[in-house]
Design a protein with these regions (language model features):
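Extreme N-terminal starter segment of soluble prokaryotic enzymes
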Residues: 6-12
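Catalytic beta/alpha-barrel core
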Residues: 12-14, 34-42, 61-164, 178-184, ...
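Conserved, mostly hydrophobic/aromatic
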Residues: 25, 203
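C-terminal helical cap(s) of enzyme catalytic domains, especially alpha/beta-barrels
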Residues: 47-57, 208-231
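A short, acidic, amphipathic alpha-helical segment used as a generic capping/interface helix at domain edges
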Residues: 161-171, 186-196
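Residues lining hydrophobic/aromatic ligand-binding pockets adjacent to catalytic sites
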Residues: 196, 200, 215
Length: 231
């Protein structure tokens, strides 16, 4: 089935690496941008480039995600501190920066993510225990990859998984104001029952070869076409 966003849902762009792309996407009312700080990623962005981008076009109404995977704790803390300091010095935010999020895809325990005392999202898969969700004081979003949910559906385990997930959410006290996020590729064809199980607040799409003319050379017309087709 063709994916079209429901009312209230947002698009998030993963692997953002230049100002021009962000500016173009902002014109399409996209306000969620993830920066890939995983050194082995094709979309890896160095800290100084990230800081230059935010210094030039930081918007207090946007949401910015710093994506890490199996990174050293002190590296995460330094980059987070530098980003928050830049935002505060820009005069566009108070000391409490609420639109900078950590993003993790390494399958570690939630208490590790909680140790940064910063709003975060994590990519949920078979490495996590659903009962650990109750530890999520700073947890703001859970990301499901479409490939993982499709695997559960194909193996006949999706219904059981959803039941366990919703059961754990109901046990959380106090209830968290938490978003559900679905990450998928531009040409993924989601199975119909997926949206009976979940109401996603955010759908994330990557900057990859499907929207590039060559490596890190965005085909802006094609990207616009894809994004407009989801809105």
């Amino acid at each position: 089935m063709e994916l079209v966003l429901t009312m209230g849902s947002r698009i998030k762009i993963d692997g953002t690496y230049n100002q021009n792309t962000i500016t173009m996407l902002e014109e399409l009312k996209i306000n969620d941008f993830s920066f890939d700080l995983r050194p082995k990623s094709f979309n890896f962005i160095q800290e100084h480039v990230l800081l230059d981008i935010l210094k030039a076009i930081y918007r207090p109404w946007n949401r910015y995600y710093l994506h890490f995977e199996n990174e050293k704790e002190y590296v995460i803390e330094k980059i987070l501190h530098d980003v928050q300091e830049l935002v505060v010095k820009s005069g566009n935010s108070t000391d409490l920066v609420e639109n900078i999020f950590l993003e993790f895809s390494d399958g570690l325990a939630l208490h590790y993510y909680e140790s940064f005392k910063t709003p975060y999202l994590f990519h949920l898969d078979e490495r996590h225990r659903l009962e650990d969700l109750k530890a999520g004081k700073y947890l703001r979003s859970i990301n499901f990859s479409y490939s993982y949910l499709h695997h559960l559906q194909q193996s006949g385990k999706l219904g059981e998984f959803v039941g366990g997930f919703l059961k754990q959410l109901k046990r959380m006290e106090p209830p968290l104001k938490m978003e559900l996020m679905l990450s998928m590729d531009w040409n993924d064809d989601p199975f119909f029952s997926l949206f009976h199980y979940f109401q996603f607040n955010v759908i994330s799409f990557p900057l990859n070869q499907k929207v590039e003319l060559s490596y890190r050379n965005i085909d802006y017309e094609l990207l616009k076409k894809y994004v407009k087709g989801k809105l």
